[in-house]
Amino acid sequence: GKFAREFIFQIPELLKTEKNPNPTASIVPNGYLLMFGPEHAEEQYRALENHKECDAGTKNIKGSELPKIFPYINNEGIETATYTDSKIEGWIDPFMFHSALKSKATELGAEFIKGDVKSISEIKAKTIISAAGCWTKELLDDIPVVPQKHTVFRVKCPKHIPEMPLTGDLTTGVYWRPEGKEYLAGSPNSVFDAEDLEPAWNDFEELVWPALAQRIPAFEELKLTGGWAGYYDCNKLDNNAVVGKHPKYDNVYMASGFTGRGLMQAPGIGRALTELITTGSYQSINLDCFAVERVLKSNARPEPYVL
């Protein structure tokens, strides 16, 4: 994540091409705020120690202190919160980021092939990287990465708070952030292997709106203006990534199962796999904790918080 932040802030220089001389990811540096109830407080305090060791810049805020910093928040039921401010975190436009990466890769010689499969034949390759996301299990049946459908709602509120960070309420699983003059809000519900991408509209009235209005009183007046559903590539074993060499093959590597965090982890994963493939080992960050072997042996490393 730290490397991704550095990479994204350097996009204008790193991803500049002849065809795209001014690449951008439209960074909105509003920060991240995650709130926890008493049942998860101790677990989060332990996680913060790891954040400190990694110099992640994460700050702890007592639940009682939240209204002093974010006066629009109702802190009822919140024991503690973690916050990374606008100098460190925020969100970007994923389409623009993807386009900039693709443009640079093309300039460096990568070839992208898109089309309908008419027939099947062998293709010989020195190195293969499976980055098939939600469809990983269709290619490699021993890797339990499958589509997990999530719904996001777009809402409008008379009171707009443009400086609001991306906020996750772990007491309900609902998250939200500003999007232009509106807000995006995510449902805590998900469906594995869903064949359709019809939004779960009932979730808004039953789950999302009550949670938003309880936590941000101004949201009692919000109106639903739209929504959509999309897939996370979810590793059903532990909600964590599967990265590294596949032990059953001489030349197959994995980069999958990011459970909605692929964009923020992509730069670091790309660098790590480049090192592993070209030198035989990780050089910058050791990602053995995400090794394929752990999945094949069902050695879970659970990621407890997925928004």
What residue ranges belong to the model's regions?
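Active-site catalytic microenvironments for nucleophilic, acid-base chemistry
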Residues: 10-14, 104, 108, 272, ...
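Dinucleotide-binding Rossmann-like beta1-alpha1 core, especially the glycine-rich loop
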Residues: 1-69, 173-174, 212-213
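Short loop/edge segments at beta-strand edges and connector loops
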Residues: 62-63, 114-116, 226
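A general structural signal for well-ordered alpha-helical segments in protein cores
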Residues: 1-8, 41-48, 63, 97-98, ...
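Helical element adjacent to the flavin cofactor pocket in flavoenzyme catalytic cores
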Residues: 84-127, 131
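C-terminal catalytic lobe of FAD-dependent flavoproteins
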Residues: 216-307
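Short beta-strand to alpha-helix junction loop
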Residues: 2, 34-43, 84-103, 199-204
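Active-site substrate-recognition segment that forms the wall
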Residues: 16-29, 127, 132-251
